[in-house]
Design a protein with these regions (language model features):
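Acidic, glycine-enriched active-site microenvironments
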Residues: 10
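Patatin-like phospholipase
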Residues: 1-4, 13-169
Length: 169
């Protein structure tokens, strides 16, 4: 089974053995809705939204651990939706399937492929192995709405940019 964007989510669930009723229940769940809305679950807010308390009146922080050639200025937000909660939902949803197939999507209940877009090389990426959650996350990361994801040093966005109907994969 193949899919792009939302089709990657549905296709991956089917490939993992979910029934249509199971999929509907999952997609209507509050956890899943919270994931794509960008709202951080209350129990995680402390870890992601709170600053570490310090005795300083104010502070300025610099980090030189990355060389200047890798410097990427962040003047504008890269997405409308904060991806933290979505990433947590996807880890919970896809971790067992990734572990059981050992990263080979041919070993899922139904062999699976999804399409993502290589931002810099302007071509489709056929995701056939690796972390299933990352592959699906890349395939459904609609530009400006969701932050792109880096997989194997490739920045990946929504697969619908180059192949919205992947019947040729």
């Amino acid at each position: 089974i193949t899919g792009t964007s939302m089709g990657a989510i549905i296709g991956s669930l089917y490939a993992m053995g979910y029934s249509p009723d199971d999929m509907e229940e999952l997609l209507k769940s509050e956890d899943f809705k919270r994931g794509y809305s960008g709202q951080i679950e209350e129990k995680y807010v402390y870890h992601f939204k709170k600053n570490v308390p310090t005795p300083e009146f104010f502070n300025i922080r610099f980090s030189f651990k990355d060389s200047l050639k890798n410097f990427k200025p962040q003047f504008l937000p890269t997405s409308v939706v904060n991806p933290i909660q979505m990433n947590l939902v996807f880890v919970d949803l896809y971790a067992r399937a990734t572990a059981s197939c050992k990263g080979d999507f041919d070993k899922l209940f139904v062999p699976f492929r999804c399409i993502a877009s290589d931002v810099y090389n302007k071509k489709q990426l056929v995701m056939r192995n690796g972390d299933l959650g990352d592959a699906v996350r890349a395939s459904m990361s609609f530009p400006f709405m969701f932050k792109p994801i880096e997989i194997d040093n490739v920045l990946a966005y929504d697969g619908g940019i180059y192949n919205n109907f992947p019947t040729d994969v």
